[in-house]
Amino acid sequence: MKVLLVFDFDNTIIDDNSDTWIVQCAPDKKLPIELQDSYQKGLWTEFMGRVFKYLRDEGVKADELKRAVTSLPFTSGMIELLSFLRMNKDRFDCIIISDSNSIFIDWVLEAAAFHDVFDHVFTNPASFDSSGRLTVKNYHAHSCTRCPKNLCKNTVLGEFIDKQLQKGVRYTRIVYIGDGGNDVCPVTFLKKNDVAMPREGYTLHRTLAKMSQNLEPMESSIVVWSSGVEIISHLQFLIKM
């Protein structure tokens, strides 16, 4: 049986937020104040829809967005980690669950030739309309009160595990690699053999530390990382167990 690796994308695989990164395509590399102030909590995808409309209205073309997105740096050690996983696909299945969008993730994975590492990518579907505007839809509707309106990562992970079980695929454990507040929900549902891997110093790490102080126990083990090379070391340890 394999290990399932679940990756976030922004600030995990890549070392920034792809949505905020493309603001560099705007005039003077910033958004108008009224557009910045239009964000409402939990409605990030709707906000980004307005950002993409503004960029289109300012004459920003798809190839400019692509140049910006594919210039995003990978997080330290992540290229080494993804290369390690490619060489060990017999031991690991890898999926991405991300609040970014399908076009940005495709661009990054294609430019770096890492598409083959991942078995599935779950994210907000995106496309360019006839006017050249990038449009992004919510991934799904859900009833989770802890997550943004467009995506509950725990629901997505649970549905994926169920579908794999229906195909007769079981995993020895789940390793969840992430950084953000929207990674808290799926991580808290991990089981005893599973591993939560929060990026050091980021929201997920701080939240799990606070939960520990408040004696809110988690079933899974927690392994903090700051480089993909550290993740490789832990995965090598797991497959030797």
From Swiss-Prot:
Claim: Magnesium is one of the keywords in the record: yes
Source domain of life: Eukaryota
E.C. designation(s): 3.1.3.74
Residues at which substrate binds: 19, 99
GO molecular function terms noted in the UniProt entry: metal ion binding; pyridoxal phosphatase activity
Positions bound to Mg(2+): 8, 10, 179
Swiss-Prot/TrEMBL keywords: Hydrolase, Magnesium, Metal-binding, Pyridoxal phosphate
Gene3D superfamilies referenced in this protein's UniProt entry, alphabetically: HAD superfamily/HAD-like
Coiled-coil ranges from the UniProt annotation: none
A Pfam match: Put_Phosphatase
Catalyses which reaction(s): pyridoxal 5'-phosphate + H2O = pyridoxal + phosphate
Active-site annotation: 8, 10
Cofactor(s) demanded: Mg(2+)
UniProt-listed NCBIfam families: DKMTPPase-SF (TIGR01489), HAD-SF-IB (TIGR01488)
Function in brief: Phosphatase that has high activity toward pyridoxal 5'-phosphate (PLP). Also active at much lower level toward pyrophosphate, phosphoethanolamine (PEA), phosphocholine (PCho), phospho-l-tyrosine, fructose-6-phosphate, p-nitrophenyl phosphate, and h-glycerophosphate.
PANTHER family in the record: PHOSPHATASE, ORPHAN 1, 2, PYRIDOXAL PHOSPHATE PHOSPHATASE PHOSPHO2
Entry's family note: Belongs to the HAD-like hydrolase superfamily. PHOSPHO family.
Descriptive protein name: Pyridoxal phosphate phosphatase PHOSPHO2
